Amino acid sequence: MLQIYNTLSKTKEVFTPLVGNQVRMYVCGMTVYDYCHLGHGRSMVAFDVITRWLRHRGYDLTYVRNITDIDDKIINRANENGEPFDVLTERMIAAMHEDEARLNILKPDQEPRATDHIAGMHAMIQTLIDKGYAYAPGNGDVYYRVGKFAGYGKLSRRRVEDLRIGARIEPGEAKEDPLDFVLWKGAKPGEPSWSSPWGEGRPGWHIECSVMSTCCLGDSFDIHGGGNDLEFPHHENEIAQSEAATGKPYAKSWLHCGMITINGEKMSKSLGNFFTIREVLEKYHPEVVRYLLIASHYRSPINYSEENLREAKAALDRFYNALKGLPEAAPAEAAEYVERFAAAMDDDFNTAGACSVLFELAREVNRLRESDLSAAAALAARLKQLAGLLGVLQLEPEAFLQAGAEGKVDAAEVEALIQARLEARAAKNWAESDRIRDQLTAMGVVLEDGKGGTTWRLAD
């Protein structure tokens, strides 16, 4: 029985789809003005694992993740670069897809872009105006009337009265209330804009997601996800817009993943304390980065550090060493391990608990390989199958172990040195053999001489 923590109710609930076996999930995606940082990677990987598990459980899942391709940050960066905004966004979208592929992230079923849904935004805004939830003061802007929506604050547990304390209307804004937020922004000189019933302009951020989600999944759907920094105001405002416009409940369950932190602060571009996925992948194998992101529960924060990445590498080394050198085999039944793995994942997608089951499996594989190679191989196949549900341990063990965490060793150079050492040993040139071994050790390479020849791996 799958249970998920619903931010809306602040409780763990038994998951029941709205319609039969169908699950419709929308996740807030990237604002594509720069390369993805590791915090974005955390959200991508978290909902990738959730997607894999829902499908494994037999649900008919439709996964939608949007792209915000018009925004103040995009306009500012394009102006800084001296390029059209859509040239910038196309380049960043391509880079995002490359990062995802390297982290073994499955593609969403749909990936709508905000600029493809302008007409839908006009329609929802007009509906909100007609119902009295929005107003156009005549300056080209359109605002949402927060005080009219009785349920405002129900996701984030904020009270409108408390939010008004200290709130103020900025110069140039034509709001009725400091809490009102923009649905449509009147055009400014030199900015991209679209025609609308209220004049040239562009959409506000919040209306984009309300329109894209309901367009792709319907007025009501099962799961809405994103980083926990989006809970307020973005997701709160989405609920206010969508439920006022449709008169129906918006998303049944809200899932929020924790942040990547550095020294206790959220990793973010605005704070300048971020590492792009690309920068991290220059030093660490993609699977090391992915494992770091799944080793903790998706709602927990992850502290970014070199030490934590090295620990992730060491964990994967243990797994791949358990899988190494075993023949192909059908997966063992391993009912107890399978049931405990499933119990962890059914408990709000508890990947940390699932990984602990994988470690127990790896220990048992290592124990069995000394006495029953076929049983070890079958259990290893089950280990690989379960790990695949988390998107890890699908490489050839030797390939991963030789690639290492940092990828700075040239495999061809290592193989050439090993061959030279074998030739030195055959010629009984022990001094040369030892010199080559010392050279390899200095490179971080560990040699393992066995009956089948010499294999190598990188030191932990």
From Swiss-Prot:
Q: Name one Pfam family in it.
A: DALR_2
Which cofactor is essential here? Zn(2+)
Q: How is the cofactor bound?
A: Binds 1 zinc ion per subunit.
As its record notes, the protein acts as a catalyst of: tRNA(Cys) + L-cysteine + ATP = L-cysteinyl-tRNA(Cys) + AMP + diphosphate
Q: What is its EC number?
A: 6.1.1.16
**Which biological process terms from the Gene Ontology are attached to this UniProt entry?**
cysteinyl-tRNA aminoacylation
Q: Which domain of life is it from?
A: Bacteria
Q: Where is this motif: 'KMSKS' region?
A: 266-270
Q: Where does ATP bind?
A: 269
Q: Where is this motif: 'HIGH' region?
A: 30-40
In terms of InterPro entries, this protein maps to: Cys-tRNA-ligase, Cys-tRNA-synt_Ia_DALR, Cys-tRNA/MSH_ligase, CysS_C, Rossmann-like_a/b/a_fold, tRNA-synt_1_cat_dom, tRNAsynth_Ia_anticodon-bd
> Which keywords label this protein?
Aminoacyl-tRNA synthetase, ATP-binding, Cytoplasm, Ligase, Metal-binding, Nucleotide-binding, Protein biosynthesis, Zinc
The protein's predominant localisation is cytoplasm
Write out the GO MF terms.
ATP binding; cysteine-tRNA ligase activity; zinc ion binding
Binding-site list for Zn(2+) = 28, 209, 234, 238
One cellular component term (GO) for this entry is: cytosol
Where is the protein found, in the record's own terms?
Answer: Cytoplasm
Q: Which HAMAP family match?
A: Cys_tRNA_synth
What do we know about how this protein assembles, alone or with others? Monomer.
Q: Which family does it belong to?
A: Belongs to the class-I aminoacyl-tRNA synthetase family.
Query: Can you say what this protein is called?
Result: Cysteine--tRNA ligase
* Species of the source: Pseudomonas aeruginosa (strain ATCC 15692 / DSM 22644 / CIP 104116 / JCM 14847 / LMG 12228 / 1C / PRS 101 / PAO1)
Its lineage opens with:
Bacteria, Pseudomonadati, Pseudomonadota, Gammaproteobacteria, Pseudomonadales
